[in-house]
Amino acid sequence: MSAFDPGQPQHLGIEEEYLLTDLQSRCMVAEPPPEVLRDCREALGQNFAYEMFQGQIEVASPVFDHSAQAGAYLRQVRSALDQALASHGLGFICAGSHPLADWHEQRATPQAHFRQLFNEFALAARRSVLSGLHVHAQVPAAVDRIAVMNEVLPWTPLLLALSLSSPFWQGHDSGYLSYRQVACDEWPRMGIPEYLHDHQAFDDYLRLLRGIGALGAEDNAWWGIRPALRYPTLELRMTDACPRVADAQTLAGLFAVMVRHACLLPAAGSQYTQAQRWLLKENRVQARRRGAQGRYLMSPDQAPMNLGQWLELAEQVFGDTAQALGEEPLFERARQLLRGGCSAERQLSCHAAQPAESDREARCRAVVDLLLWESRDSEPESTNAPP
């Protein structure tokens, strides 16, 4: 099945979304002045992109050969963005949700594409004040991307569990570690992909939905992993945005390694069954609710695993591919992430550590401060605590 030459790098790209934040109130900015967005565009250059809400922007990276390049680029981007916003009394957070954002107050970006989304999907769209980490990994033209997707799909809740960063919603503890993934289920064609055997079935699926008017001619499904339409890639969309660049780099690298591994298999995706899809859906539920405390199954015949055991299994399966790509440190970095706690756990710990007399908003402001600090960190190895 492989169409890779020996030694060929695994190309990848990243899209990150940032929530603009007032440094005084710690609230998400609803309507940033035009000069703020102008300065953001100048800071990020051609990779700047608008998002659904005026107080949210996106960066779409160039193509990289290695996750280390992606990490260096994101640090550069975040540093430039932080400098551009500072003169306006603003900062940004890169997380699945903003602890103090109120979706009622947010304003849609006045562009035709976004207006269509808000008109068509109403409350589901207006409530989607959420940010994800999207990773593109190249798949050779000769390789069926749905077969690769089916091979990688069972592992996506593991990546989600390492990315969790949206425990707060509307100023309250949601009870989930990724409330973003809960909110995503309000949309059609999100979450777990339909059960498809090959790319022809995917093309038939899109053709059917376009034929009945459910999708536009250039539209795609919004699944947590999907074949991209504009690029020869498989795109991971399930993961929450990561406050720390090191975590985003680790997750992007892991996904790229998984895709390369699948591309090298003679029969990728052939073991993906309807029963595995049922387990996949339950693993996603476990990940978004319990994270490291969840219990996970890759096979009906297997004993449940905790997240650490699942990560060990991933290293057994993908370790040789990671080594061949020069990505050996990924699994140790993932273990460090797991030992230190995902972003959602860090946010909840910060919230709980505030003085007993603190009110709900004061506790959430402290969490925003943590996210502001983690998101602006531009150093590859930072051990300093937030002030």
Curated annotation (Swiss-Prot):
Enzyme Commission no: 6.3.2.2
InterPro entries: GCL_type2/YbdK_subfam, GCS2, Gln_synth/guanido_kin_cat_dom, YbdK
Catalytic activity: L-cysteine + L-glutamate + ATP = gamma-L-glutamyl-L-cysteine + ADP + phosphate + H(+)
GO annotation (BP), single: modified amino acid biosynthetic process
One GO molecular-function entry: ATP binding
Keywords, sorted A to Z: ATP-binding, Ligase, Nucleotide-binding
Pfam families in UniProt: GCS2
Gene3D superfamilies: 3.30.590.20
Entry similarity comment: Belongs to the glutamate--cysteine ligase type 2 family. YbdK subfamily.
NCBIfam families, sorted: gshA_cyan_rel, PRK13515.1
Stated role: ATP-dependent carboxylate-amine ligase which exhibits weak glutamate--cysteine ligase activity.
Name of this protein: Putative glutamate--cysteine ligase 2
Species for this entry: Pseudomonas fluorescens (strain ATCC BAA-477 / NRRL B-23932 / Pf-5)
